[in-house]
């Protein structure tokens, strides 16, 4: 019994000491964890017109993908991700989010994860997770971030995606993808609606 009490006191002592160290520096620690100013913004993979693309890690072949992120007060991240393959695989709507929960002290050691979801029936939080990405690198010197794709229900995302911030072609890429996704959705409904109508008109066929 005395051994358990000693262990419990030790654990409590460590916890109290940890909290005592955390509280005086919580603002600095939260700034480090949240990376609000750095992560908030427009990110993309197309490094055309960027003369030092190699410094960003963008001198590799990647699909055109755009991401927009907003870091909330609690450090959670709300974002949007869009690409041709994502729109083709999820043609019902191209409202595709990329969100991350508020980080905790464990994220000093473990990378943050982001969940990709699609708006279905007017609900995003209850929709299935399409893909999970892990933020493995933050290069603040060159304004670049790297994600590792942990899971991907579409099977078409590359294993790794590298994004640069505020790249010259972001707006052009974003407009192209918006137009592409609108056409992808229209094509889907053009192909599906006649089949649905046929089933309604001939339920026994």
Question: Where are the predicted features?
Answer:
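Hydrophobic, helix-forming membrane-interacting segments
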Residues: 1-31
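A short pocket-lining beta-strand/turn micro-motif at the edge of beta-sheets
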Residues: 141-145
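Central antiparallel beta-sheet cores of small beta-barrel/beta-sandwich binding domains
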Residues: 30, 34-138, 148-153, 165-166, ...
């Amino acid at each position: 019994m005395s051994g358990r009490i000693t262990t419990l006191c030790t654990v409590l002592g460590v916890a109290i000491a940890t909290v005592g160290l955390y509280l005086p520096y919580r603002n600095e620690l939260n700034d480090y964890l949240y990376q609000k100013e750095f992560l908030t913004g427009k990110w993309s993979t197309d490094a055309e017109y960027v003369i030092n693309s190699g410094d960003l890690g963008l001198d590799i072949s990647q699909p055109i993908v755009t991401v927009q992120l907003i870091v909330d007060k609690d450090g959670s991240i709300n974002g949007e991700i869009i690409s041709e393959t994502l729109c083709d695989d999820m043609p019902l709507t191209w409202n595709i989010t990329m969100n991350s929960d508020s980080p905790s002290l464990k994220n000093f050691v473990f990378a943050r994860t982001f969940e990709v979801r699609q708006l279905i029936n007017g609900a995003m939080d209850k929709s299935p997770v399409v893909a999970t990405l892990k933020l493995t690198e933050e290069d603040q010197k060159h304004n670049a971030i790297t994600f590792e794709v942990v899971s991907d229900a579409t099977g078409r995302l590359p294993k790794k995606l590298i994004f640069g911030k505020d790249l010259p072609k972001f707006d052009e890429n974003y407009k192209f993808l918006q137009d592409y996704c609108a056409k992808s959705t229209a094509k889907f409904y053009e192909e599906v609606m006649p089949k649905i109508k046929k089933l309604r008109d001939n339920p026994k066929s």
